Amino acid sequence: MTVLIAFDGSDDSKTAIEYAARHLKPEPIVILSVWEPLLAQLTWAPLAAGVPVTAEQGDDGKFEEEKQAEALASKGAELARAAGAAEATPRAERGGGPVWAAIVDVAEEVNASLVVTGSRGLAGARSMILGSVSTRVLHHAGRPVLVVPPPKEND
């Protein structure tokens, strides 16, 4: 049973990793962090007038955002192992569109038997009950999805 866990570094995504590793005991786990180059991100963000923006790849051919996503996925895999997962593989994936679509695509690629997300992530616009990414994954994955809520304040 392969379990795909979406991880963006938010507290809710950390809770999702810890819950899955402790309660599901899946093997293997794939920890996914989705990234996109800065220029792609800026296509939907307002730009300050007159400020040139360039996206440069480093000497290793990687964008800074890709390196950050790889480090984030590795951190998520460490969290999963610390919570009891025997096998957790980090994966950084370049998003070519919405984050939820990349999660759904990777779930299909790895034939995940379950996709796990936190209820909310780091996205700026959030719905009142579930974050937009978790809601879209839930509706488009075509496979079981576990949305882990944040811990209660008094836990």
Model-derived features: where do they sit?
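Structural beta-alpha unit
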Residues: 71, 75-115, 153-155
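Short, hinge-like loop/turn segments at secondary-structure boundaries
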Residues: 47-50, 106-109, 133-134
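Small/aliphatic-rich secondary-structure junction motif
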Residues: 1-58, 83, 87-89
